[in-house]
Amino acid sequence: MSSFDDPEKHFLGNLLEDDPGSSVTSATSPFAGINGSTSTALTSQVPTVGPVMCPTELSMSNAWPEPPPPYSPRHESWGLPSNANTTLLGSSSLTSSNWFPFTDQKETSSNEILSSLNLAAGSSSPALPSTPSRVPHHPSSQVHHFHHNLHHHTHTHNVQVQNHYFGAPPPGLESFGPTRTSSTSSSQIYDAIPNPSWNYTGLSNINADSNVLFSDWKNKNSSQTSPVSTVVSESSISSNLETRPVHPPLSPSEVVEIAKEKKNVSKSYAEHLSKSTAGTQKKGAPIGAEKKQKQELAKKMSNQLPIESIATRIVVKGQPHSAPVVSRMPFSYRDVAARSDHTSSSNHPNHQPDELQRKELSSADLKLNDSKAVRTKNNDHRETGKTRNTIDPTDFNKKNRVDNEFQKINNRKNKKEKAVTEVAAPVIFEGVHPVDSSSRYDVLKNLESPNQSYHEKKSANGRPPLIQKIFSRSSSPADDIIDTEEEDPHRVRSSSTHVHQNGNGQVKKDQRKRVAQVNQRRRKGRKEEPSWLQNAFSTFVDVLFFVWGYACFGLQWTLLLIVEVCQKIADIFVTFGKSLWAGTCKGLRNVILAFVYLCFFVVFAIKSVVVRLLTFINMIGAEESDETVEEQDWGCKKEIPIATNATEFADRLSRETIRDAYSVFGLRSDCSDDDIKRNYKRLAALVSPDKCTIDAADQVYELVDVAFSAIGYKDSRSEYTLENLKNNEVHEQLISVWNDMTKAVEEARNTIFCDCENTHFRVATSISPSQARSCKRCGVKHPAKQNDIWVEKRHLGLTSTYYTCTDNVVYDITSWATCKSQRAMLKNMRAHTHNVQYRLLSPMFKNSDFDAQSQYYNSSYPSSSTDARFLSDLQEEYSTLLRQRSLAQISFKNCEPREEDRSRRAANRRQKRWR
């Protein structure tokens, strides 16, 4: 190196000088045992730089005349026979189908590196039991030489490194020329792969002592034209197709990848270094479009018939060169270490993915007999060869940035497993060219964190999160459909298939068209909207069901209501029956009791009748004694003085018990005729209607006149005897007039004067005067005095009843007390008081009249003494009320003051004493 400014070069240079002796360290060749023997020179050269090396006596640190490509060439491979199956884990004696040199210039992803190494991520043993044990890795110096060579050409010499294509074997491998070998594969896909232009029969014939330098061999055998400038005529292709179908040559790794359905065209690991960032989207193409092209190309290559490869010699710019072409700065160890932190693979063991994918491939090969598909594929290849020189160099710049990115190394397992009855592809272990060393992968794997792969999680479709995130950003819905649909058993999947960046543009266009058609077929059909008639019918059905539901509900509710009403009616009938029965029983009992009572009543009635009959009989037997008694009771017992006023005389007549002519004048029956005439003259003058103003004056005067006509004369007096009393007409007239006068006097006596000029009557009651007034404070009934007035509440205090006591009779005076004129005075009366608040005042007379009056009263009248006492008490106070017309004149007097009045008077007396 010319300078050490780049830190990556420092890093690589230090690695180269760490272990210089490792370049000559002998190790077991991965190709040992292929043809039976291997020379010692080959044993020492293979683990170092491959089958083409510098002289063995030179040290690697100071001699590198013309290093071979650090990675696999593009079109032709060196060092392996057609039937060799070699891996880094060791050689196998299994035969493999013919494999072809690399024909594509597309970059190789990390998944393809793993596939070429035949290693499963996270496992240290081969996937199949027939694989031998793993051999040691190549020395680190060889890995460093590979990377050093890459940086040497790209940085130090500033050389536009390109891939070279050789039409002849390299020095020392002349015996591995093109040969025709028959296929021993049991699968159709390996028979479909054409024979290479030159093949290897083994590495045992390599001449280690060959003096031919690699530079001379390269100048001699390298092609003079680049792959871009190489033109294959359409006629030659057509002629070749007639005799032998043309097919681009494939490498052993591509054969295995095709068997695994992972790839269709292999890529070199060197081209992987030219990838750019993975998440950048190609301009004008959506993310995920490259994957569609890969899938289409995988289907195309898997169904294509064998085509004989065309060996082309390509020389870039007239000078061959051994280093690969890189369009961008390759990755350094720092970049790889930094990216490995973000793109870790899953640590789950791979459960033989190669066998499962070969099963899928064997089922997909059943479609190879379709002639239309074969013709379509061959036409595409002819168009590819025809337009190889006309490809626009800007197509490389339009490549999707996802393809230029370092693809994540993962171990994706196909979720769908085919039936066991399908014919599996033969087990083929991918052979790795000695130059295609796995040192790059080993370094990356050593830089990878173990915890990083352990915590990696896969998404639902089996991709790691980073790749899933890239494909989830697809702008086309069809991309998601193709990516997520894993249920199609006839679809061939490829996780790392890429279209060649320098390939035919028409192929890309065809692939895009086919992808669009696939997307169009897989697009879900738009759901047809119902018409207005369907909507109307559905609405009508909904309304009908709605109405029917409510109708059912109403019918159910009505039925329940009827049932409940019937139950209530039944309960009523039951209750009525019980009540009727109980009432009937009770009625019968009452009838029986009434009959018993009737019997007792009849008995008592008969008894009373008998008693009265006996009494009547006794009265008949004592007739004579009764007549004598009647003679003695005829007239007054003693002579009564004549009354001084008409009122007193009328009152005496109304209360007289013995009613005859002698009682009217107040004389005895044995009086003289002169006494009768004298009393007649005085009484006629006293009760004369012309002079008397009482209400019953006419009746009283008539009574006096009839009595005088009965006994005023001797002849009439002799006829008015006790024997003829019942047959005397004058006596009957006397009794009739007397009754009329009594009525008139009682009516006048019970009439109460009022200012309203209406007539108010007092009504006699059966209340005893001794227990007349009820007292609320004492809880007992006090006796009532003459003319006392009190009030009682009835009907829950709603009505008031006023009473007064006169002549030892309690009268109801409510009509007079509730009159409009009297209400103002009596409305404040308190009911059920202990003391009497008001008293009723009667008309007064003079002492002479009173004395004369008292003389005419009957001694048997109970109220005579009471009236006299009352009149004597009130004579002085109410002298102005004397001689009034009414019989029942009333006045008020506070007989007993109220309690508050007493307290007020006592306070006044105390105040006077203080003064």
Swiss-Prot record:
CDD domains: DnaJ. Keywords: Chaperone. Residues 22-47, 494-505 have a biased composition (Polar residues). Residues 660-724 form the J domain. Residues 1-48, 122-142, 267-300, 338-399, 474-527 are annotated as: Disordered. Residues 510-525 have a biased composition (Basic residues). Residues 1-11, 289-299, 351-386 have a biased composition (Basic and acidic residues). Signal peptide: none annotated. SUPFAM superfamilies: Chaperone J-domain. PROSITE patterns: DNAJ_2. It comes from the Eukaryota. This is DnaJ homolog dnj-5.
